[in-house]
């Protein structure tokens, strides 16, 4: 692939790690963020110590205070910002773009009020004449591992297979490999909803439960994620792939996962406000829990784990009582869809 100029919107942990992958592949990377000190640090010290204490970035990776400068002449734009600000940032990008670009995103969540997926937000806010079909970059990936070039395999999903193949070629190298998929609904819902289950898995750990319980919440969590996704039009096969069970395993079992760590703290009795303050990073699973619960109610989809986590986070329900209620639900067949 010829050298591409890629604007990376969001200098968080994942945006930074993906920037390094793109740079390793010989592409020109332009990061944009709105924290002046962070942008200056990337340019001057070639570090992003807010997320990576010991990592030195290549000097060719540049960061910009100006969104217009970051977008100037870009071949592709990669959104890696928190879900709750995606619409606002997309509006700003749309106002500046003056040519057609490939548009990708690597965020995982549902918009709090509308319950919309991120690709839908981008489609609504960026006119079609300025962009390709949206490509979703998602899968089992800790930024802490990708930044040190550990092997990572994820998915590039788009309604346009050629757009997905472009992103596959853009990112793939000897340690970072992408597979294409055209099931955007499946890939996005898997990536968003697994954060809820990771909060629950962390909570079980914080409460002192063992591996049996953790395996149970991951597998039954995958079942209810699949139920909601299929109701929205996804293929059930997607949930057995990298963006489904793969991402759920890595997020639901690892201390690297901020959602798992948040759940662990909840299980140990910490208050949510304190957890969010101490984390210093967005915990997508918290806001996604509310959106998914409301969506499940609207579509009449059975999601007992999501409902339990919602009650604990948003209604102050006792976490041990929530577990008791799940364990005493009516008996079900394992593959029941309701």
UniProtKB/Swiss-Prot annotation:
Protein location: Cytoplasm
Any one annotated GO CC term: cytosol
UniProt KW DNA damage keyword: no
EC id: 1.1.1.94
GO molecular function (one): NAD binding
Alphabetical GO biological process terms: carbohydrate metabolic process; glycerol-3-phosphate biosynthetic process; glycerol-3-phosphate catabolic process; glycerophospholipid metabolic process; phospholipid biosynthetic process
Position of the signal peptide: none
UniProt key word NAD: yes
List of residues binding NADPH: 13-14, 108, 143, 258, 282, 284
Catalytic residues (UniProt): 194 (proton acceptor)
Pathway the protein takes part in: Membrane lipid metabolism; glycerophospholipid metabolism
Keywords for the protein's UniProt record, in alphabetical order: Cytoplasm, Lipid biosynthesis, Lipid metabolism, NAD, NADP, Nucleotide-binding, Oxidoreductase, Phospholipid biosynthesis, Phospholipid metabolism
Catalytic reaction annotation: sn-glycerol 3-phosphate + NAD(+) = dihydroxyacetone phosphate + NADH + H(+); sn-glycerol 3-phosphate + NADP(+) = dihydroxyacetone phosphate + NADPH + H(+)
Binding site for sn-glycerol 3-phosphate: 108, 139, 141, 194, 247, 257-259
Gene3D superfamilies in the cross-refs: N-(1-d-carboxylethyl)-l-norvaline Dehydrogenase, domain 2 (1.10.1040.10), NAD(P)-binding Rossmann-like Domain (3.40.50.720)
PANTHER family to which the protein is assigned, alphabetical: GLYCEROL-3-PHOSPHATE DEHYDROGENASE, GLYCEROL-3-PHOSPHATE DEHYDROGENASE [NAD(+)] 2, CHLOROPLASTIC
Function as written in the Swiss-Prot or TrEMBL entry: Catalyzes the reduction of the glycolytic intermediate dihydroxyacetone phosphate (DHAP) to sn-glycerol 3-phosphate (G3P), the key precursor for phospholipid synthesis.
UniProt record similarity statement: Belongs to the NAD-dependent glycerol-3-phosphate dehydrogenase family.
Protein name per its UniProtKB record: Glycerol-3-phosphate dehydrogenase [NAD(P)+]
Native source organism of the sequence: Streptococcus gordonii (strain Challis / ATCC 35105 / BCRC 15272 / CH1 / DL1 / V288)
Lineage: Bacteria, Bacillati, Bacillota, Bacilli, Lactobacillales
Name of the gene: gpsA
């Amino acid at each position: 692939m010829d050298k591409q100029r890629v604007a990376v919107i969001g200098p968080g942990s994942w945006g930074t790690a993906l920037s390094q992958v793109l740079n390793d592949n010989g592409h020109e990377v332009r990061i944009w963020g709105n924290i002046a000190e962070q942008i200056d640090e990337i340019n001057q010290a070639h570090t992003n110590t807010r997320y990576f204490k010991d990592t030195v970035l290549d000097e060719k990776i540049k960061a910009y205070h100006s969104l217009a400068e970051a977008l100037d002449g870009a071949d592709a734009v990669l959104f890696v910002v928190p879900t709750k600000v995606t619409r606002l940032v997309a509006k700003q990008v749309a106002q500046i773009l003056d040519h057609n670009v490939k548009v990708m995103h690597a965020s995982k969540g549902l918009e709090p009020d509308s319950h919309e997926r991120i690709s839908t937000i981008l489609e609504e806010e960026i006119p079609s004449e300025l962009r390709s079909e949206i490509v979703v970059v998602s899968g089992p990936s800790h930024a802490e591992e990708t930044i040190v070039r550990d092997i990572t395999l994820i998915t590039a999903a788009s309604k346009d297979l050629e757009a997905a193949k472009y992103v596959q070629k853009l990112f793939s190298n000897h340690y970072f490999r992408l597979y294409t998929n055209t099931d955007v609904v499946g890939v996005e819902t898997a990536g968003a909803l697994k954060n809820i289950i990771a909060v629950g898995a962390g909570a079980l750990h914080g409460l002192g439960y063992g591996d049996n319980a953790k395996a149970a919440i991951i597998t039954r969590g995958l079942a209810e994620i699949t139920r909601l996704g299929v109701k929205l039009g996804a293929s059930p096969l997607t949930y057995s792939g990298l963006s489904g069970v793969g991402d759920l395993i890595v997020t639901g079992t690892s201390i690297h996962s901020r959602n798992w760590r948040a759940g662990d703290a909840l299980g140990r009795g910490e208050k949510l406000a304190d957890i969010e303050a101490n984390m210093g990073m967005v915990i997508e699973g918290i806001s996604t829990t509310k959106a998914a619960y409301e969506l499940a109610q609207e579509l009449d989809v059975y999601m007992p784990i999501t409902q339990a986590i919602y009650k604990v986070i948003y209604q102050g329900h006792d976490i041990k009582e929530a577990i008791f209620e799940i364990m005493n639900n009516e008996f079900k067949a394992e593959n029941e869809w309701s």
